[in-house]
Amino acid sequence: MTSGRAPHATVLLLVGAVVASACGNGSATPIAIESPRQATAAATPSATPPPTPTPTPKPRFWPLTGLSAPADASLTRRPLNVRLPNDPNARPQYGLNKADLVFDLIVEGGVTRFAAIFHSKDADVVGPVRSYRFSDLHITEMLRGGLVSSGSTVQEHDAVTASINAGKMLSVDADRDARPYYRLASRPAPNNLFTGTPADREAVNRAGGGGPVDVPALSFLLPGADPSSGGLAGAVPATKIGVPFLGVWASSFSWDGTAKGYRRSQNGAQTVDGDGSGPILAKNVIVMTTDIFQTAVIEDNLGSKGLDYRMTGGGAASVFRDGLRIDGTWKRDGALDMFKFFDPSGTEILLEPGQSWIHFIYPTWNVTSTP
């Protein structure tokens, strides 16, 4: 049987001594002598490198809601500011539950309208859509957004055009691109113009605004954080809130302890989304005082003059979250900065992740609340 070991080399050496042979022939007989076996060093096993740890993905949050964003979400897509009416025959509005923010703003004659901001979610049906005001210019510039509306006065149109030309915002209002808009036969004009944010985004792309933008962020508690943290100096219980707009535009909010948010009502009726998704739930209700002044622009056929707002600098603010009221201040340094809120100690108030409703009122008005 053949051995599995490698054969060893042999060396033939001639021995100098003459060995007597029984044959007596005197010749030297070569003797085969095996050479010493070479020791083979044992192989040293190579060290196994430790496994490379999988990096933990950095948490991502939507800038206008503070809610977690999936890995493939585009946090830098352009927000949309959709202008919605708030008069009784325009209700219920469609798409409100999909908005990240809703600004409730006084326009001419004490009427209020909504600036509904869509960023983290899209809504297939939004409306009715109405005309914009100077306040929409400030909000849309702040968000680097796209303005969605039915049109405006000549003066407001010119102001928005100047902002577009300066690269501060975009507008896809119906006067500039009618393709995202349609009329509902079931509703009387002018509250029958509707749109959808997917179609609005296509219009934004056509206008050259499909690239990334730096969306300013509100300041939020981290998801799951203790609600008692985040700037609550001087906080008092507040389960009912009254926003002092005039007449049928006055609104109220009631704390829903089960849903952990505020339910909005107007004229005694709960505010619901017309798309059937249910009542509004605001995680934060914010009321800011500022200078609101009349312009020379005629906004309607009654001769009502439009309003404009001071939205930079600062002023008094009341922030409602988690069933509490914090009276403090608001601050906004420049036209591209987001609003910040501070409690009486100077600590920044952090908002609850979710939808926020923001209101501006005159300095002489007061927001009411009950424990």
Residue ranges of model-derived segments:
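Intrinsic disorder/low-complexity segments enriched in small, polar and charged residues
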Residues: 52-54
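Short, low-complexity, disordered segments immediately C-terminal to signal peptides
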Residues: 24-48
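Bacterial N-terminal signal peptides that target proteins for export
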Residues: 1-11
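C-terminal motif of bacterial Sec signal peptides marking the signal peptidase cleavage site
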Residues: 19-22
